[in-house]
A protein has these predicted regions:
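Short, flexible hinge/linker loops that cap or flank conserved catalytic cores
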Residues: 4, 101-102, 125, 278-280
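General small-molecule cofactor/ligand-binding pocket signal
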Residues: 39, 46, 132, 144, ...
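Class I SAM-dependent methyltransferase Rossmann-like catalytic core
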Residues: 58-100
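Aromatic-acidic/polar surface patches that form glycan- and anion
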Residues: 88, 169, 184, 208, ...
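Short gly/ser/thr-rich secondary-structure transition/capping motifs
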Residues: 90, 142-143, 267-270
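Conserved SAM-binding loop
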Residues: 97-202, 211-216, 288
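S-adenosyl-L-methionine-dependent methyltransferase catalytic module, highlighting the catalytic core
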Residues: 174-175, 179, 189-310
Length: 310
């Protein structure tokens, strides 16, 4: 496991910590955290500036005290999804490429790693000693708890960042991407997956959707290595069928059963030309490299590869 203590900073004043008696103390006397030990949830330090956070410290601690049960349910839900949806063909291909191309001496950051993302299990096994992972809730899969809008790392700390199915759940995606840019070394790599044609999931903590062009715009400070859909029109239809029957019968159980009946729809993605899947895909991936110069608005418009022409 990587020793990440040398790259950690206070989330409030952005200065380094001093380690005292197995705790981390901010010694900046102008900081709101001055001489205040970081709180812990079980064995995980919490690097959050609660003066600039979406929920109060009290509510946050209450949420995390009960989050294990919530996350077990989410894990069960993901297990069911793995049966119905299988693994995205594109995700599997992308992860294989990442494994084959990644240097085993580089630092890897996983943003939102409380649950190991689809297709990432093998990646974790291959690069376990290189990965630093955090999320907003307690999980055995993470090294600590932090806010992706305000990452507790020094500039230029990582060689590679993975953020999978997270950006739709943050309040300010552009801010999170700017933080990724900040903590990545020059020419560092990013791999992101975000949904497009998916209904609301995780209730009040679901905020955004991105087209492929919108995803590209979000990462306009990065050179595009590869981009595309991770689930096509068939997968999008499968999502809609679940929510249609859930609403029609006021029953999530019936919605899940409908997915079991129509699981085969996801294989139709393979029969549909890419340009149509881009216009109605379930989600998109972006693999890129950090660059100093932003791409222009015209380049974002020209990036479109869907079926519609003007």
């Amino acid at each position: 496991m990587i020793d990440f203590n040398d790259i950690l900073i206070c989330p409030s004043c952005r200065l380094s910590f001093e380690k005292i008696n197995n705790s981390k103390i901010c010694n900046n006397n102008a900081c709101s955290n001055f001489k205040t030990p970081l709180i812990k949830i079980k064995d995980k330090f919490v690097f959050i500036d609660f003066s600039n956070f979406m929920i109060s410290k009290t509510n946050f601690l209450e949420f995390n005290s009960s989050s294990n049960n919530v996350r077990k349910n989410l894990f069960f839900s993901k297990f069911i999804k793995s049966i119905i949806y299988g693994k995205s063909f594109k995700t599997q291909s992308n992860i294989r490429r990442l494994i084959n191309n990644n240097d085993r001496n580089k630092k890897i950051l996983v943003v939102g790693g409380g649950t190991i993302g689809a297709g990432l299990s093998k990646f974790y096994k291959e690069f376990k000693k290189q990965i630093i992972s955090f999320d907003i809730y307690y999980s055995e899969n993470i090294d600590f708890i932090a806010d992706a809008h305000n990452m507790p790392f020094k500039d230029l700390s990582f060689d590679f960042v993975i953020i999978q199915a997270v950006l739709e759940h943050v309040m300010y995606p552009n801010k999170v991407v700017s933080e990724i840019y900040r903590v990545l070394k020059n020419d560092g790599l990013i791999y992101s997956e975000t949904p497009f044609m998916q209904q609301v999931h995780e209730g009040p903590y679901d905020f955004s959707r991105f087209t492929e062009s919108g995803h590209r715009l979000l990462f306009n400070n990065f050179e595009c290595i590869k981009s595309g859909f991770i689930g096509g029109l068939g997968t999008s239809l499968l999502w809609s069928i679940e929510y249609f029957f859930t609403g029609l019968f006021r029953s999530r159980k019936i919605g899940k059963i409908s997915k079991l009946i129509f699981f085969w729809l996801r294989f139709i993605d393979l029969l549909i030309p890419n340009k149509y899947n881009i216009d109605g895909g379930c989600g998109f991936f972006f693999s890129g490299r950090k660059k100093i110069k932003k791409i222009s608005d015209l380049e974002v418009v020209d990036f479109y590869n869907g079926s519609q022409t003007f």
